[in-house]
Amino acid sequence: MVYENPDGVMVGLEVHVQLNNLNTKMFCGCSTQYHDSEPNTHVCPVCMGLPGALPVINKRAVESAIKIGMALNCEVVEQTQFHRKNYYYPDLPKGFQTTQYDFPIVGNGKVVIEGEDGEHVVRITRAHMEEDPGKLVHIGSIDKSKGTLIDYNRSGMALIEIVSEPDMRSPKEARRYLDKLRNILDYLDVFNGDLEGSMRVDANVSVMGGQRAEVKNISSHKGAERAILYEIMRQKNLLRRGGEVVMETRHFDEARGVTISMRTKEGEHDYRYFPEPDLVPMRVSDWAPAIREELPELPDAKRARLISEYDITEMHAKALTSDIRVADFYEVVAAAVEPRVAGTWVADVLKGELNYRDLSVDSFTTDDIIQIIKLVVEDKVTEQSAVDVIRTILDDGGTPMEVVTEKGLLKVKGDVVTEAVSETIAENEAAVQDYLGGAEKSLNFLVGQVMKKTKGRADARQARELLVAALKS
């Protein structure tokens, strides 16, 4: 099926990634570990823009930017350069932002996502380095604030801005692109995505070939999807009423789910870019071969290898590789038990229980899941009981055998199951008659009653076989 886009929706994203796994900021020696600190305590003359303070480039930040570019299939330039982007805003103490203009460090890349009609390529225009401004803390909402406080702890943090072409055609595609980008960045270990402000999105949205509006500083992937959906509907409704979409910058109000006009969109000439006189151009192409050697296995390559090496399903491989920690966890488990069985238990069962509790895979040990799987494979507990063991460990702690012993979960067999089957038949005459009359679903009910009597410790397949045999005799 070919996806049709009758409204001509075009979405391009500018994603600002804070390289917070570095020890120091982009151009000074201030610590990056400011998130739990008092405001304005991780600052110095450089990141405060005091007269006479001179910047020094963080080499590790440059290496991280090149690594990100390579992972996004970008070309690394031979020589790159910093520029001053001149504008006044309270969170920018220097009166300009040190960024890159016509010599970005990488460009011309691509990311492949699942589109509306199969695989879809999102082109990467460029990715460039810049410094983060400070943080404005509004007293009240942004549009009705009684005052604004400024925290400069964030000022000068190393950022890489990843700019896409307007290749996304729906809010869902934009969300998938962001998820894929986050996945790649996690594998590169260049940032901690759990920290506030580590990944911020500006969305450029247009419909029906009209002007684009830019929605700034969206803080989450879900928020970006909602903001883009609202903006598409706003522009379509405006055009249908005979109005005109103007090029402007808008803010997304998370609480109300709406975008609000902030200002008319500036052009590049408004920023009066010029080369940063305190920083010389850098020749970075010579660094590329060594950095490429350090690139880890990326999500798409890992997914293909897991399918080939362990013979697991593509669905399981996607679930496992969506988080590098889960993928690594799985490979340890797959070395100890049958890989396809391990795939089911890690990708479906354990990951589902972790997601339900908003926990990471670090909350469970490979030794515990291996022991639980072996209990099932060795016919000592049922699958239902094994799930109960996982839930109990996550909620209350303990080891698999402690939980099995305390809750009496060892599998029951023989006479115990036969007796439960006989009691179930005797106590559920209506369901028995329905089954004998051809209602197959009544058998499922009877199996459930046997499982209930044995507290989930009987083998459901065996219970079904015994029921069928008894009812046909």
From Swiss-Prot:
Which regions span the lipid bilayer?
none
Which keywords belong to this entry? ATP-binding, Ligase, Nucleotide-binding, Protein biosynthesis
According to its UniProt record, the EC number is 6.3.5.-
GO terms (BP aspect) = glutaminyl-tRNAGln biosynthesis via transamidation; translation
User: Any idea which GO molecular function terms this record carries?
Assistant: asparaginyl-tRNA synthase (glutamine-hydrolyzing) activity; ATP binding; glutaminyl-tRNA synthase (glutamine-hydrolyzing) activity
Pfam families in alphabetical order: GatB_N, GatB_Yqey
Its UniProt entry gives the catalysed reaction(s) as: L-glutamyl-tRNA(Gln) + L-glutamine + ATP + H2O = L-glutaminyl-tRNA(Gln) + L-glutamate + ADP + phosphate + H(+); L-aspartyl-tRNA(Asn) + L-glutamine + ATP + H2O = L-asparaginyl-tRNA(Asn) + L-glutamate + ADP + phosphate + 2 H(+)
Q: What function does this protein fulfil?
A: Allows the formation of correctly charged Asn-tRNA(Asn) or Gln-tRNA(Gln) through the transamidation of misacylated Asp-tRNA(Asn) or Glu-tRNA(Gln) in organisms which lack either or both of asparaginyl-tRNA or glutaminyl-tRNA synthetases. The reaction takes place in the presence of glutamine and ATP through an activated phospho-Asp-tRNA(Asn) or phospho-Glu-tRNA(Gln).
Q: How does it assemble?
A: Heterotrimer of A, B and C subunits.
Family (UniProt): Belongs to the GatB/GatE family. GatB subfamily.
Full protein name? Aspartyl/glutamyl-tRNA(Asn/Gln) amidotransferase subunit B
**Organism, as annotated:** Methanococcoides burtonii (strain DSM 6242 / NBRC 107633 / OCM 468 / ACE-M)
Q: Which gene encodes it?
A: gatB
